[in-house]
Regions:
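Short, surface-exposed ligand-recognition loops at beta-strand->loop->(often short) alpha-helix junctions
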Residues: 11-19
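Short structural boundary motif marking the start of a folded domain
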Residues: 3-7
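Short, intrinsically disordered low-complexity segments
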Residues: 34-84
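Short, flexible, solvent-exposed loop/turn segments with mixed acidic/basic and small polar residues
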Residues: 1-2, 32-35
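A mid-sequence interfacial segment
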Residues: 84-94
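Generic recognition of short, well-ordered alpha-helical segments
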Residues: 19-23, 58
């Protein structure tokens, strides 16, 4: 049975321009992410999934698909519920 999970993604964006970062933030919001105002680069999204791992995978997939159009290095920490925290580092080329 599917449940709704709140997935937290904290990021570090290396080598991205200010305009590209603003555009990316707007696109993330269009895809259901909500910016967490207390941290400079943290996002939350609600995902319907069978478990916490699936919810984190969905959130990562959406986040990466939005980001991959910009050339920069993305470092992220992803967490949902009580399961293990996922750490990822990805580089995107122009």
């Amino acid at each position: 049975m599917s449940q709704t999970y709140n997935v937290l993604i904290a990021t570090e964006l290396k080598g991205i321009g200010e305009d590209a970062e603003k555009e990316m933030a707007m696109r993330l919001e269009e895809h259901g992410f909500e910016k967490i105002p207390t941290l400079s680069s943290a996002w939350e999204i609600k995902c319907d999934a069978e478990g916490e791992s699936e919810a984190k995978d969905q959130a990562i997939q959406i986040f990466v698909n939005v980001c991959r159009t910009y050339p920069f290095e993305l470092r992220m920490v992803v967490h949902a519920g009580t399961s293990q925290i996922i750490r990822r580092k990805k580089s995107f080329e122009a």
